[in-house]
Amino acid sequence: LTPRTEEKEGHHVRIKIINPNTTWSMTEKIGACARAVAHAGTEIVAVSPAMGPVSIESHYDEALAVPGLLQEIAAGERDGIDGYVIACFGDPGLKAARELARGPVVGIAEAAMHLASMVASRFSVVTTLGRTMGQAWHLAEIYGMERFCANVRACELPVLELEEPGSNARERIVDECRRALDEDGSDCIVLGCAGMTDLCEHIAGLLGVPVIDGVAAGTKLIESLVTLKLKTSKHGELARPLPKTMMGALEGFTLRG
C-alpha cells in the first residue's frame, strides 16, 4: 500500500474551522463535528474571533463578523494552517479570506450545496430565521446551485436557541425538514446553520434521506484539497491584497508590502 501524502512527508493536515460568531459553546460543537469526520491524521483547530457578534442573523451582523474572521485567517497563516472552513451559512468574508490565505478556504453553504448536488436531484435548505432566506438563495445562485435548490425554508428559530438546554429547536427543525420533503419535491436536506451540526445524523435517521451539514462537508472538502495539493490561486482576483494603510479602528488591518 502506498503511504498517504501526509505520512510520507511527515506532515499532518491542519485545518482551522472558524465560527465567525463569538459564542464559544457553538464553536466547541462545531469543532467536535469536524473532528468526528476528519481523518485520524488531521488536526482540527476550532476558533471564534476575539471580536464580533454573538450570533449572525442579518447582513449587519455578517459585515461586523468579517474583521474578526480575517484576523483568524491571518493568524492561521502565521501558524502554518493548511486550509480553512468558514462555519457560518452566509459564508461571510469568503473571498477576502481567500485573498489572505495560501491554502484553500471553503464556506459551509458552498460545501453543503455542492455535495448535495452530487447525491440528490433537488435539495431544500432548512435554516433558522426567515430574514436569512434571501442570502441562502443568493448563495445558491452565485454557486451555480439554483437549479438544484428546490426551496429555502426557515424555522423562525433564533440561532442561540440552538444552544439552550431544554429548547424544542430540534423538534421544530425536524418538522420543517419533513415538510420540505413532502412539499418541495426535494430528496435531500441541507442544514442552513452551523449551529445545527450536531443534528445531522439524527435527522437523516428519522427521514431516511441524505442530510448534509456544511461543517462536515467543508472539513472533508478541505482535507481533499490539501491532499491534492490544491491551494488558492494567487493569479488574478484572489491574489494577496495590495499593501494599504488602514485608518482608525482598522489600523491593525494595514497590510505591508
Give the residues covered by each predicted segment.
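N-terminal beta1-alpha1 ligand-phosphate binding loop
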Residues: 15-37
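N-terminal beta-loop-helix "entrance" segment that forms/cooperates
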Residues: 46-73, 160-165
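Short, Lys/Arg-enriched N-terminal segments with co-localized hydrophobic residues
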Residues: 1-12
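Periplasmic-binding protein-like
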Residues: 17-18, 78-88, 185-194
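Active-site rim beta-loop-alpha module in soluble metabolic enzymes
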Residues: 137-192, 199
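Short, well-structured alpha-helical segments in soluble
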Residues: 63-80, 171-185
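Short, acidic/small-residue loops that bind anionic groups at enzyme active sites
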Residues: 98-119, 202-222
